[in-house]
Amino acid sequence: MTGGQSCSSNMIVWIPDEKEVFVKGELMSTDINKNKFTGQEEQIGIVHPLDSTEVSNLVQVRISDVFPVNPSTFDKVENMSELTHLNEPSVLYNLEKRYDCDLIYTYSGLFLVAINPYHNLNLYSEDHINLYHNKHNRLSKSRLDENSHEKLPPHIFAIAEEAYENLLSEGKDQSILVTGESGAGKTENTKKILQYLASITSGSPSNIAPVSGSSIVESFEMKILQSNPILESFGNAQTVRNNNSSRFGKFIKIEFNEHGMINGAHIEWYLLEKSRIVHQNSKERNYHIFYQLLSGLDDSELKNLRLKSRNVKDYKILSNSNQDIIPGINDVENFKELLSALNIIGFSKDQIRWIFQVVAIILLIGNIEFVSDRAEQASFKNDVSAICSNLGVDEKDFQTAILRPRSKAGKEWVSQSKNSQQAKFILNALSRNLYERLFGYIVDMINKNLDHGSATLNYIGLLDIAGFEIFENNSFEQLCINYTNEKLQQFFNNHMFVLEQSEYLKENIQWDYIDYGKDLQLTIDLIESKGPPTGVLPLLDEEAVLPKSTDESFYSKLISTWDQNSSKFKRSRLKNGFILKHYAGDVEYTVEGWLSKNKDPLNDNLLSLLSSSQNDIISKLFQPEGEKSSSAGVEANISNQEVKKSARTSTFKTTSSRHREQQITLLNQLASTHPHFVRCIIPNNVKKVKTFNRRLILDQLRCNGVLEGIRLAREGYPNRIAFQEFFQRYRILYPENSTTTTFSSKLKASTKQNCEFLLTSLQLDTKVYKIGNTKLFFKAGVLADLEKQKDVKLNNIMIKLTATIRGYTVRKEITYHLQKLKKTRVIGNTFRLYNRLVKEDPWFNLFIRIKPLLTSSNDMTRTKKFNEQINKLKNDLQEMESKKKFLEEKNQKTVNELENTQDLLNQEKENLRKNESLLNRVKTSSETLQKQFDDLVSEKDEISREKLEVAQNLEEAHQKIQGLQETIREREATLEKLHSKNNELIKQISDLNCDISKEQSSQSLIKESKLKLENEIKRLKDVINSKEEEIKSFNDKLSSSEEDLDIKLVTLEKNCNIAMSRLQSLVTENSDLRSKNENFKKEKAALNNQLKNKESELLKMKEKIDNHKKELATFSKQRDDAVSEHGKITAELKETRIQLTEYKSNYQKIKEEYSNFQRETKEQEQKKRNSLVESLNDSKIKELEARLSQEISLNQYLNKRISGNSVETNISSTRRSTSYSDDPLDKEDIIKKYYDLQLAFTEITRNLENEIEEKKNLISRLRFTETRLASSSFEDQKIKAQMKKLKKLIQDMDPSIPLDSILNEPLDNCPDKESDINKLMLEVDYLKRQLDIETRAHYDAENAISALHSKFRKIQGESSLSSSDIYKLKFEASEERVKSLEDKLKTMPLRDRTNLPVGDIIKNRDSISKYEEEIRYYKLENYKLQEILNESNGKLSQLTLDLRQSKSKEALLSEQLDRLQKDLESTERQKELLSSTIKQQKQQFENCMDDLQGNELRLREHIHALKQAEEDVKNMASIIEKLKTQNKQKEKLIWEREMERNDSDMQLQETLLELKRVQDVKKILSDDLAHLKERLSAVEDRSQYTDEINRLKEELNCSLKAETNLKKEFATLKYKLETSTNDSEAKISDLLKQLDHYTKVVEMLNNEKDAISLAEKELYQKYEALNTECESLKGKIVSLTKIKQELESDLNQKTDALQISNAALSSSTQKNKEITEKIKYLEETLQLQMEQNSRNGELVKTLQASCNGYKDKFDDEKQKNIDLYEENQTLQKLNTDLQLQLKNLHERLSDTTEKNAWLSKIHELENMVSLETDLKYEEMKKNKSLERAVEELQTKNSQQTDVIELANKNRSEFEEATLKYEAQISDLEKYISQQELEMKKSIRDNSSYRDKVQEMAQEIEFWKSRYESTMIGSKNIDSNNAQSKIFS
C-alpha cells in the first residue's frame, strides 16, 4: 500500500514517526528534490505535524510515505473495507479507536480481526448467543446484507452463525481459519466457536427442557467441549507471550446430520513442537501434563509409576524451565479437569494409567546420566530398571539398544558403541518420539469416542494454526509455519478473487480480473518445487538421504541453486543463513540443525525392542505401520515409521515431506469448503489491559495478510454503497447554479436514476465509479472527497442559516419595540379623550351612569332561565350516571363469563399437555426399544464375531498340539535311534575286549583306538543327556499347554452357553419386534391411502394458485404499461418545454444574424454576384456528385456483403456436411472428438458471453449517439427552414432593387445566365432524385433483412438439425471473421444464392444482426450527407434569391423552367414505376432463392449439378454487374447530352434508355429464371414446390400487412402524443391563469390581514377591560373542568375494559392456534386408536369445514375488534375536540361579557350532554355486541371441545397431510418466486423490445419529416418560380 493517494495541499495526512509509528499532520506544499543515494528526482511533501504548537516546525517527507486521513464519519467503522482511504495508518487508527472502547472484533473485508483484550468482557453469554442465533429471523444475514439497518456488531459468533447458516442453506462444507501469533487468542476463539455451535444445536439449559432424548445430545456436545482440556494439557505450554500457548496446529471437523444437529467430531493435528520436551527457555515451561501429573497424583500412584518425588527440580527435563507461580494456571485443578474430561470422553482406567505411565517414562529418561569409561563407549551412571519396567523391556536389551545398538551392514549385523553425547541424543529422540506417538494415540482415542457412527451430511472445520512468525533466530520450524501460512494466504487470495468476480458479474460491472494467487507462487515454488531448480524442502530431503551430509553441504547446495536465480531469495550476512521474501516481509533463516530436525531417527534395534514390549501401550505405539489402523493425524505425524525395512513395508519419510503431504490434504479439504477467515492479534507483549503497541500490531497485520487483503481490495472498487443511502447522503452536493426545480423534475421513482443524475452533476470520472444493479462501486478515496465537499457545503449552509436566524431575531425585537410604542400611544390618546369628555361633556357623564341600570332587569330574567336549565342538566347527568352503573355491571358479567371460558380453555390445555406427555413417553419408549434392538443386533454381531474368533483360536490350538505331537514323535524316534546306537557300541566294546584278549601284541594300537572310542562315548553321552533334557522341557511345556487348553476350553464352553442363552432371548425379542413392525407397516399402508386423497385435493389447490398467478401477471403488465406511458408523457413534456426555450433563443439569434447579413448583402451585392454564381456552381456540383457516387458504392458494397457472406457460409457448410456424411468415424474417435468439442465449447461459450456483453455496451452507446445525431440534425433542419422562411418574408417585404434597372439591362448577357441557371436547377433535381433512389434502396435492404429474419425463424422451426449452441458458436465465428470477410467481399463478385443449404441460412440469421449494425453506421453517414445536402440547398436558396434581383428575362426562364419541371416530373414518375417493377422482380427473385434454400435438404444427392448452377449464376451476376456499370455510365452520358439537346429530345432519349434498361434487366432475369427452371426440371419436377412458393408469398403478404398495421399504430401513437402535448400546453396555460388568480387572492388576503390587525388592536383594549371579569369566572370554570375530568376518567375506564376484552379475544385466538399446533404431537396415541379408520375421511372433511368456519368467525371477531378500536379512536378525537372547544371558550370569555359567556357555556354543555347520550347509547350497543360475541365464543368453545375429542381419536392422517401440504406449499412458493423472476426478466425484455420499436418509430418519423421537408423545399422552389413569373 503506497502513499500519496491524491494528496493535495492544506490536507490532513498521516506521516511516519519513530515513536508513534504514524502521526497526523497538515500538508502545506509539495516540492521536488534529488535523492542523495540514487540521484533521481523525488516528490517531497512539506508537512506541519498537528501535535506541535510551533508554526515553524515543518517536516519534509517523501510523498510516497504520506497517506490521506479518512473523514471523521469513518471513525470506528465496523468493516475496514468501507474506509475510503485504505492505508496502513487508517487501519491502525480505526483498530486503536475500537480497542479503546472494548470493541475487540472488527471486519476487514472477508477477515474478522480479533484483538486479545487481556481481561474478561461480557461478550460470550447466553444472551449474546441468542442474539446472534436469532438474527436471521429478523433480517437475512446482516453481514451479507450490507444495506441492512439492523446490522449486529462484529463478533466471533457472527462468523460461526454465518458458517452454520451456509451449511444448512447451501448444503456445502464450511471451514473457519483461525490464525495468529502465540497469545493472540486463537485457541480461545476456537473454544467460543465450539461453545456456540454446541449451544445452538443442543439448546441451552435455560431454553430447553430436559427430555430423555436431549440429555444424550447434551452429553455428546459435552464430549466435544471436554476434548479441549485434554488437548490443552498435552499440547499447550506456558511461553513468554502466552500462559496457555498451543504448541501444535489442529483442524477440528464438527459433523452435522441432515437436521443440522451435531453428529460427530474429528480432530487432525499438525506440527507438534517435539523439541520442547527436551529443551525449553528458562522463562517458559514444558507441556502442562508434566506439572499436572506431579502435583495432581497421590504418593502411592507416583510410586506405582516409579516417580520418587513431586519436586520439579528433581527432573532434568523440567529443572531448567520456569518454576514461578503463573497467574491463571492451577495445576492441581487442571489435573482434576483433565481426569473428568478423560472419563467423559470415554477413556478407561487402564488407558489413563498407560498414558500417565508414558509421561512418567519420559520424565525418567530425562534423568539418565552417563559415565564415559573411554571416549568411544558410554555407560549408564544410574539405575535403569525403573524405566525398563515401565517400558516393559529387558534391561540388558535396552542398554545394548542405547549404548551399543546393532545395525545391519550388508548381510551381517554389526554393533556400534556410542559415546555419552550420542547416547544422550538417542534418549532425547526416544522421549520426543514417545511423546509424539502418545499425543497421536490420545487424539485417535478422542476421535474414536467422538465418532457417532451414523451418516454425516456436512461438517464445519475449525483450523487453529500458528500464524506467520518472524523471530530473531528463525529455524526449520518457522520455515514450515511460514510455508503453510503462505499457502493459506494464496488460498485466501484465490477465494477473494472468486468472490470479487462473482460480485462484479452479479452487479453487471466490467472489470479486468487479476488472479492474485499468482503473486505468491514464486515464493511457494522456491520452497516446494521439485525442480529444476529444486526448492528448499526437496533439497533438504535429498541431503537427508545422502550419507555423511551436513548442514554446510545443504547450505552450499541451496546457495548454488537459488542465489541470483530468484527475486524472492537473498543471501544473508549471517553464517549459514539466507533470506526469503514472503508476503508478510523478509525472513532471515539459519540452517543449523536442519538435517537432524528433518530426520529425527530412532535406530532399528530400539524400535524392534519397543515394538515387542510387554507393556501394551508401548507395543501399540511402536506397532509396525502395516498392522495398525490409525487416523490421518497420527499417520501424518508419527515420525519414525521408516525403520526396519526388512520387518515392515514402510519407507523413509522426512519431516518436511510429511508436512507437505499434510498441507496438501489440508488445502484440498479447505478447497472443498466455504471458508471464513479469523485473524487474531496480540496488542502488546506485556499482557497489559488497553495498551496498544502500534508497531507490533502493524507487523501482525502484515503477517496475518490483513493488509494484503486490503491491498487486493484497493485494486477493484472497495467502497460499496446502496443507491438510497448514497442519494440521501450526497443529495446536498447537487450544484446550486442549476435550480432545485429542474433537479426535482429530473428525479424519478427509482433511486438508481437519481444517483445517475447526481453523479453526472458531480462530474466524476467514470473510471472512478461503477453503477451496479443494486449498489454503487467506488475507487478508494472517492467517498472521502465527496465527504469533504459535503462538509464544505454544510459549513456554508450553516453560516447562511445562522446569519438569517440572527437577522430574524434582531428584526423581531425591533418590530416588538415598535408595536409597543404604537400601543402606548393609542392607550394615551384614548385616556386623554376619556378625561376630556368627562370634564367637558355632561351628556357623556349621564350616559355612563344610566347605561348599566338599563340592562339590570333583563339580566334578572336571564339568570332565572339559566338556573332552570342548569337544574335540568343536573337531572340528565344523574340519569346518565345510573345508566353508566348499569352498563358497568353488565361489563363485569361479560368479564366473568370470559374468565370462565378461559378456565375451560386452560382445562383443555392441561388435557393437551397430558396427551403430549403420553406422546413423549410413547416416543421415548419406542426410541429406547429401537436402541435396545440396535444394541441387541450389535451384541449379536459381536457374539458371532467372538464365536468365530474362538473357533479360529481352537483350530490354531489343535494345529499347535498336532505340531507338538509330531515333534515328540520325531524326538522319540531319535531316542530310539540313539538307544540302538548305544547297544551297537556296547557290542563293539565286547568285541574289542575279545580282540584284546586274543591280540595282546598290538596293545599300543588298541590303546590308541580305545582312547578314541572313550572320547566318542563321552561325546555321545553328552548328546544323550542334552537330548533327555530337551525331552523333559518339551514334556513340561506339553503339560502346561494342555492345562492352559483345558482352562480355555472350560471358559469357552461357559461363554458359549451364555451366548446361546442370549441368542435365544434375542430371537424371541426379534420375533416380537417383527410382529410389531408388521403392524406398523399395515398402519402405514392405510395412512398412504389417505395421503393419496389429500394429494388430489392439493392438485386442485395448485390449479387455483395457477389462476391467481395468471391474474397477477395481467395486473402487473397493465400496471407496468401505465407507468411506462406516464413516464414517457412526462419526459416528452419536459423535452418540449426545453425545446420551446431553445427555439425562442434561436429565433432571437436568427433575427440578429439576419439584420447583420442584410447589411452585408446590400454592400457586396453587385460585386460578388457573378463570381459567386460561377464558383459555387462548379464546386457544389462536384461535391454532390462525389457524395452521390459514395452513397451508390456503399449500397453496392452492402448488397455484395449480404450475398457474398451467404454464399461463402453455404459452401463451407455444404463441405462440412459432405465430409461428415462421407467419412464415418469409429466410436472411440467420435467419443474423443466429442470430449474435445465439449472442452472447446465451454471455452467458446465463456468468450462468447464476454464478447456479447461488450457488444451490448457498444450497441447501446451507438444507439445513444445515433439518436443524439438524429435529434441534432432534425433541430438543425428546423432552424434552417425557419431561416429560409424569414429570409423569404424579408425579401418579399423589402424590394431593394428597382425593376426599371433590371428591364433596361442589355440582352446579351441573358442567355449565359439562363443556361447557368438551367444547369444548376437540373443538376440539383438530378442529385435529389439519386438521393431518393439510394434512400429507397436502404429501405429495401432493411425490409429484405426483416423478411429474412422471419423466414429464418420459420426454417429454424422446421429444421431439426440446428440448436442454440451451434448458433452461439457460429455467431462467434462470424464475429471473429468480420474483418477478413470485409476485405474479401470488396473483391468478390456477386454470386447466385439458389444453392444455399439450410444450415447457412441459420448462420445468416445470426450474421444479419451484425449487418444491421453496419447498416446503422451507414445510416449515420447518410444522415451526414443529408445534412450536407441541406446546407447546399440553403446556399442554393440564397443564390436563387440573389438571382431574383437580376431578372431581366424572367418570363422566358419561368416558361422554360415550367416545361422542364413537367418533363422532370414525368421522368421521375417513370423512374419510380421502373424502380418499383425492379423491386418486385428482385423480391420475386429472392423468394425463389429462399424457396430453393428451403428445399436444399432434399437435394443433397445432386450437389455437383448445383455447383455448376452456382458457377453459371456467378457468371450471370458478373454480367449483371457489368451491365449495371455500363448503364450508369450511359446514364451519365445521356444526362450530359440532355443539357445540350432540346427538351423534347431529352424526354424521348430518357424514356428510350429507361425502357431499354428495363428490357435488359427483364431479359436477364427471364434468362436466369429459365435457366434455373431447366436445372430444376432436370433434378425434380417443379410442381412440388409451387405450393410452398405460394405459401411463402402468403406469409410475405401477411408480414407486409403486419408492417402496415404497425405503421398505423405508430401514426396513432404519434397523434396521441400530439394531443397529449396540446393538452399539457392547455393545462399549463390554465395553471398560469390560476397562478394569476391566486396572486390576486393573496393581495386581497394581505389587505384583510391589515384590517384584522387593526381590529386586533381594538380587541386588545377590550381584553384588558374584561380581565377583571374573567378572574371571577375562573372558579366556575375549575368546577366544570372537574366534571369534565370525571367524564374523561369514565371514558378511560371503558376504553380499558374494551382493551381487556380485545386482549382476551386475542389470547383466545392464540390459544386456539396453540391447540391446533399441539394436536400435531398426538401421533402415537392416535395410532393406538386406528380401529375407527373407516370414519377418518368424513371426520377430516368435517374438521376442515369447521376449521374454515372458525377461521371465518375469528376474522369476523377481529373485524369487530378493529371497529371497536376505530370507535375508541373516534372517542379520543371527540375528547380532543372538547379540549379545543374549552380553549375556544376561554377565548370567548376574554372577548365577551359574563352573561354571553354563560349562555355559550350552557349551549356547549347541552351539546356535550347530547354527545354523551349518543356515546352511551353506542357503548350500550357495543356491550350488547360483546355479549353476543361472548355467547358465540361459548358455543364455539363447546363445539371446539367436541371437535378436540374427535380429533384426539383420529388426527394422525390429517397431521401428516398438513405437513405434506406445507412442504408442497413451500415448493409452490419457490416455484412462484421462480415464475416471478422469469416474469421480471420477460418484462425487462419487453421493455427493451419496446425501446427498440420506439427507436425504429423515431427513425421512421425522422425520415418522414426529412421527406416532408424535401417536399416542402421543392414546393418552395415552385412557389419561388411562380413569384418570379409574377414579377416578370
Swiss-Prot record:
Domain Myosin motor: 75-791
Disulfide cross-links: none
One term of GO molecular function: actin filament binding
InterPro entries per the UniProt record, alphabetical: Kinesin_motor_dom_sf (IPR036961), Myosin_head_motor_dom-like (IPR001609), Myosin_N (IPR004009), P-loop_NTPase (IPR027417)
Gene Ontology cellular component terms for the protein in this record: cellular bud neck; cellular bud neck contractile ring; cytoplasm; incipient cellular bud site; mitotic actomyosin contractile ring; myosin filament; myosin II complex
Region (Actin-binding): 460-529
Record region (Disordered): 629-657
Keywords (A to Z) from UniProt: Actin-binding, ATP-binding, Coiled coil, Motor protein, Myosin, Nucleotide-binding
Positions contributing to ATP binding: G180, E181, S182, G183, A184, G185, K186, T187
Something else known: Present with 2140 molecules/cell in log phase SD medium.
Protein name (record): Myosin-1
Species per Swiss-Prot/TrEMBL record: Saccharomyces cerevisiae (strain ATCC 204508 / S288c) (Baker's yeast)
